[in-house]
Amino acid sequence: AKMCTEAMKNEMFRSIVSTDATTIQVQRNGQQADVKLESTDVLLGNYDGACGVKTGFTEKAGECFAGAVQRDGKILFAIVLDSSSEAQRFTDATTLDDWVYNNTIDYPLVHSDETTTYTTSTGTTATVPVVANVSHSGWMDKTFKATLSDPTASVKVFSLDGNVSQDVQFDTVSGDVKPGQKVGTVTFYQHNEVIAQQDLVAAETCPAPNPIEGIGIWWNRLFAGFSGEQTQAESSVVNSTPLIYGSNATINTTKEG
């Protein structure tokens, strides 16, 4: 699999192994002759996304096949050794491929029952899910709603790799806040690997305190600091990451058909 991974990075190699048939010209008895070459990879043109790589046979490894399938921009390799026949090695490979694809799901990045509506810079209204409530550093008690830069986005994940988690990093926000303004970053992980990352953006306006309000807030913070009281509202995460694996899974990973 590692050899295939590296080899398929070469565009010429990929072009050759993904071709099911071609004709080349050779010299034969002093004249040019056409020779038709046909791949022994029967999956090419017959299995969605099949793009190589190599059939083979050895006494110790038996009927072999290193298969590659590309879907949604990602290549999946199925390596088969010691299959029972030439035909069976392809069935073995597609069985492995199908198992992976049947356990691959579209996982929405946003899971939030709370929504908010705001007016965009073009004058249209937009209703979006609330991902977090973000603290405004200019105030002691104010937060504003935020969403993802693309709240409809999803990512394909292999469900058996484990559940998805999120890490929300909030920016220090000051000044007037307008919808669409970046106020943080949300990173999504599966099995300790980053699977998606998006900007956290404001989903409503939040004016900064005016100079008079700012003076009052400064004094209030001073007194609050002496008494150990909170001097700024805390940001909070609204979005959840439902389980996709295990007995408590809440997302259905069973595919129909």
Show the residue positions of the predicted features.
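Domain-terminus/edge residues, biased toward the C-terminal soluble/receptor-binding domains
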Residues: 1-257
